[in-house]
Amino acid sequence: MAIKFLEVIKPFCVILPEIQKPERKIQFKEKVLWTAITLFIFLVCCQIPLFGIMSSDSADPFYWMRVILASNRGTLMELGISPIVTSGLIMQLLAGAKIIEVGDTPKDRALFNGAQKLFGMIITIGQSIVYVMTGMYGDPSEMGAGICLLITIQLFVAGLIVLLLDELLQKGYGLGSGISLFIATNICETIVWKAFSPTTVNTGRGMEFEGAIIALFHLLATRTDKVRALREAFYRQNLPNLMNLIATIFVFAVVIYFQGFRVDLPIKSARYRGQYNTYPIKLFYTSNIPIILQSALVSNLYVISQMLSARFSGNLLVSLLGTWSDTSSGGPARAYPVGGLCHYLSPPESFGSVLEDPVHAVVYIVFMLGSCAFFSKTWIEVSGSSAKDVAKQLKEQQMVMRGHRETSMVHELNRYIPTAAAFGGLCIGALSVLADFLGAIGSGTGILLAVTIIYQYFEIFVKEQSEVGSMGALLF
């Protein structure tokens, strides 16, 4: 069945737009340049409004997922990386359930990647139509078929640009991947904005600055009771406060600390005597992949729930999936799940909410830990990082594990890699929950993604530096 499926996909893969692999080794300076160009294009698309929309002032139904999915409401980046990640999620689940078996051959890998890109384009079209027809930009009957089609085309072209930008970096022209770059940029931008935003918000206590740092100085300057001013700056509700900022810094430090946890397996050369090395198996073996896929799962569930809720409000099954309420406290108007499955899969708003509704907290914790562990364990099977794949790579490099024969390497690696993947995914989920409960800026998932991505780029720089010799030689 797997071969038949990949063969069915093959004719479509030929006509898909594709970035050619570089014919020569790309120098680090060029990689930095291409990465900067990619980021510039993404940021420009984040600021270009969609042409033809009548209104985007209503409550934002996807406010809680925008930071993680690198999307910006009412712009060309409305969909963000959602189509790419969703297609990856679908293909992984199909491969994990053995509905599609991906072989070890380069041909099968290429067809699998092509199928993922094809699904990404189909999902882009589907999400574009759903966004337009559910009235996110105005009543479709008032806008007319022409404007609806125009908005759909804009969203599709923007989604295609994101797909190609991600492929450009992954083919070796830039550093890391487009998905990682866009997520990290969006989250870091959010953190900086929440800390230093000069925007004023009218609260019950009067006009206050949104940014936590600016609010601290403003409150100290305008309040006669300095102790109360400090208390407000640290604990004010519905706006970023200093405790949120401290929690964010704390989570950053904890994740970076855990990044250093690993098991070094001793290996030696099968060709040369006395040549020894180690193969590191990190605690976060699959890095941030589990949390990205978990976010894609939840975001698509939110989309389906809100679409059904808008059309069939009051239906029992729709209500069981999720009921939604609009809120505008402490920021822009947004929709928030207040009941049903979506409510229990969303993080509690604060530590106080955990105490008020412990069942919600327990369900959320179990879901986060379980889903992250599952996605992490299944990801290694389809990404070429399982014990069998690692043993094959070591064999190609003529390396063997010390104290083990070449034939027993897979068995020995199986003792470590699946465990590291599952336990690492579990830890990723636990850290995300901790960040949510502490009230970290940008959500626990967002902070975790930002730290792991920034650490990945740090490792890339260190690796390139060791190859070239110095940071100056890298850039100049």
Curated annotation (Swiss-Prot):
Question: Please, which domain of life does this record's source organism belong to?
Answer: Eukaryota
Give the bilayer topology.
Multi-pass membrane protein
Q: Per the record, what ranges lie on the membrane's Lumenal side?
A: 47-80, 132-148, 197-241, 307-356, 438-443
Q: Which Pfam family would be a valid example here?
A: Plug_translocon
One GO process term, biological-process aspect:
protein insertion into ER membrane
Q: Name one GO cellular component term.
A: Sec61 translocon complex
Gene3D superfamilies, sorted? SecY subunit domain
Spans within the Cytoplasmic topological domain: 2-28, 98-109, 168-177, 260-285, 380-420, 459-476
Family that this chain belongs to: Belongs to the SecY/SEC61-alpha family.
Subunit details = The SEC61 channel-forming translocon complex consists of channel-forming core components SEC61A1, SEC61B and SEC61G and different auxiliary components such as SEC62 and SEC63. The SEC61 channel associates with the multi-pass translocon (MPT) complex.
Functional summary from the UniProt entry: Component of SEC61 channel-forming translocon complex that mediates transport of signal peptide-containing precursor polypeptides across the endoplasmic reticulum (ER). Forms a ribosome receptor and a gated pore in the ER membrane, both functions required for cotranslational translocation of nascent polypeptides. May cooperate with auxiliary protein SEC62, SEC63 and HSPA5/BiP to enable post-translational transport of small presecretory proteins.
What is this protein's name? Protein transport protein Sec61 subunit alpha isoform 1
Q: Which organism is it from?
A: Canis lupus familiaris (Dog)
Name the gene.
Answer: SEC61A1
